[in-house]
Amino acid sequence: MMMRVFIAMFFLLALVEAGWPRLYDKNCKKNILRTYCSNKICGEATKNTNGELQCTMYCRCANGCFRGQYIDWPNQQTNLLFC
């Protein structure tokens, strides 16, 4: 029983140290959670004339390793995303 508790605590500690699983929105429509990845330019999100978001990816973003900021379009400018 104690061994199971120890293993469970070990995995919980490893999960907390590595960070909780991150989510990203490949369609660039939701709030993208920040992670601690490199600052390589990964993609570009733009808003076209009819108001739809277009997301162009320049590199592969590993699942859970994609960061950016909340996509807000007050002046319809380009918003860069990083991975």
UniProtKB/Swiss-Prot annotation:
List all membrane-crossing ranges.
none
The record's account of tissue expression is: Expressed by the venom duct.
Q: What is its main location?
A: secreted
Its subcellular locations are: Secreted
The domain of life is: Eukaryota
Keywords from UniProt, A to Z, are: Disulfide bond, Neurotoxin, Secreted, Signal, Toxin
Task: Enumerate the GO terms in the molecular function aspect.
Answer: toxin activity
Q: Tell me which positions the record assigns to the signal sequence.
A: 1-18
Note the pro-peptide positions.
Answer: 19-26
Gene Ontology, cellular component aspect: extracellular region
Modification after translation: Contain 4 disulfide bonds.
Q: What's in the domain note?
A: The cysteine framework is XXII (C-C-C-C-C-C-C-C).
Give the UniProt family note. Answer: Belongs to the conotoxin E superfamily.
Its annotated function is as follows:
Probable neurotoxin.
Please state what the protein is called: Conotoxin Im22.1
Q: What is the lineage of its organism?
A: Eukaryota, Metazoa, Spiralia, Lophotrochozoa, Mollusca
